[in-house]
């Protein structure tokens, strides 16, 4: 029986059939699978399937850890703005987590970085600020630090 059919019949009892009100609660709920055919005899080989995270990325775990740490330290409250200098993956995950938690998210990216990644963050509710390509990562970090300091935003690290 499919997960959906089980939910409709009221007897879906496996973790993969749970219904969540908060996408961040699914982060890290990734299976470990024993690889039977690729490992040499006598070797137990396991893989952690991180692509089961909401955005199919290990960066989902990092993003929720950064946000929860900021919340525990009292640096993040409803309505806060989170800013990060990013090449994309962590920023995408932070945009998702911030959208769920009620924070504004701003990513600082160099103009040389992927246009596709720059498009995903606004789709998740984030804003993207572009820095000149020749400044690279250093320029991104400097801009993020400057904006965090000047505007009182939470700098994701």
Residue ranges and their predicted role:
Residues 1-157:
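PLP-dependent amino-acid enzyme catalytic core
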């Amino acid at each position: 029986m499919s997960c959906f059919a089980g939910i409709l019949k009221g007897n879906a009892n496996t973790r993969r059939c749970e219904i969540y009100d908060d996408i961040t609660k699914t982060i890290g709920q990734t299976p470990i699978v024993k690889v039977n055919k690729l490992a040499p005899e006598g070797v137990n080989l396991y893989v952690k399937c991180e692509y089961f995270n909401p955005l199919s990325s290990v960066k989902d775990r990092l993003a929720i850890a950064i946000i929860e740490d900021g919340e525990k330290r009292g640096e993040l409250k409803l309505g806060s703005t989170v800013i990060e200098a990013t090449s994309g993956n962590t920023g995408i995950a932070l945009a998702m987590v911030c959208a769920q938690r009620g924070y504004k998210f701003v990513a600082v990216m160099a103009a040389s970085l992927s246009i596709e990644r720059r498009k995903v963050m606004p789709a998740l509710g984030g804003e993207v600020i572009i820095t000149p390509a020749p400044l690279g990562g250093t320029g991104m970090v400097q801009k993020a630090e400057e904006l965090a300091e000047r505007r009182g935003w939470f700098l994701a690290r």
